[in-house]
């Protein structure tokens, strides 16, 4: 067996062991759900890293993101030519300024309802596949697309309706992600395909960790997604 594979198996075992060791309620850990998440994450990682179609999809996504960054960088160069056309450019202008022009794209997609539909579809599928509560699954997908701060803002209505234990779960999950602007900055430092591959894998890892550290049983009548209409009726 490949030594690299053995090291990774040991790492996953240690990862699960430490999470179980610090669990708030070891008796309520849902091993079936965690096993499904581990299996799904393994298949996802293999698909994105090894499978040709998966690698092609990641490369296309990375190329698209890099094209957005380059286009935004052209705008920065037009506005701040004296700051950009230098031998040693500051990180503010080389990595962060272009992101300020890219992030509004997510706002536009949200405004027209495109991004919410994608998030809801993926969140619903993840919940059905793994057996995790609906909102936690939706929130994981929101983090993947929007980042922690934006996801919390979008989900503010739901946060007011769920109990403190589930809020703790979301707080833990929020520590595992970064905003789109930081991801964009990372793509300027290393190949974008590695960054974009790590994002969905990391989201599933976050679900695994919180399912063990803070296991919560959600009754069927509470396993819902809050909407403005349902809130007004309540």
Which ranges hold each PLM region?
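Hydrophobic alpha-helical transmembrane segments
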Residues: 6-10, 31-49, 96, 118, 137-152, 196-201, ...
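Hydrophobic core segments of alpha-helical transmembrane domains in multi-pass membrane transport
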Residues: 11-22, 37-49, 97-108, 177-185, ...
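Long, contiguous bundles of hydrophobic transmembrane helices that form the permeation core
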Residues: 203-234
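Membrane-embedded alpha-helical segments and adjacent helix-loop junctions characteristic
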Residues: 50-143, 234
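C-terminal ends of transmembrane helices
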Residues: 17-26, 110-111, 152-157
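Alpha-helical membrane segments and immediately flanking helix-loop junctions
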Residues: 129-187
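N-terminal alpha-helical transmembrane segments of multi-pass membrane transport
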Residues: 1-92
């Amino acid at each position: 067996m490949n030594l690299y594979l053995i090291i990774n198996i040991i790492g996953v075992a240690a990862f699960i062991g430490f999470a179980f060791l610090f669990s708030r309620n070891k008796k309520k850990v849902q091993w079936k759900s965690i096993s499904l998440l581990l299996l799904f994450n393994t298949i996802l990682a293999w698909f994105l890293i090894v499978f040709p179609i998966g690698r092609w999809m990641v490369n296309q996504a990375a190329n698209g993101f890099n094209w957005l960054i380059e286009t935004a960088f052209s705008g920065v160069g037009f506005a701040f030519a004296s700051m950009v056309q230098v031998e040693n450019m500051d990180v503010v202008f080389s990595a962060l300024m272009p992101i300020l022009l890219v992030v509004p794209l997510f706002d536009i997609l949200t405004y027209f309802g495109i991004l919410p539909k994608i998030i809801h579809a993926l969140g619903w599928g993840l919940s059905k596949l793994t057996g995790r509560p609906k909102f936690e699954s939706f929130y994981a997908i929101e983090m993947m697309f929007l980042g922690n701060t934006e996801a919390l803002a979008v989900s503010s209505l739901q946060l007011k309706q769920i109990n403190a234990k589930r809020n703790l779960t979301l707080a833990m999950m929020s520590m595992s992600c970064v905003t789109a602007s930081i991801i964009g900055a990372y793509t300027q430092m290393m190949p974008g395909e590695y960054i974009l591959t790590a994002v969905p894998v990391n989201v599933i890892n976050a679900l695994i960790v919180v399912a063990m550290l803070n296991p919560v049983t959600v009754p069927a009548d509470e396993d819902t997604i809050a909407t403005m209409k349902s809130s007004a009726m309540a």
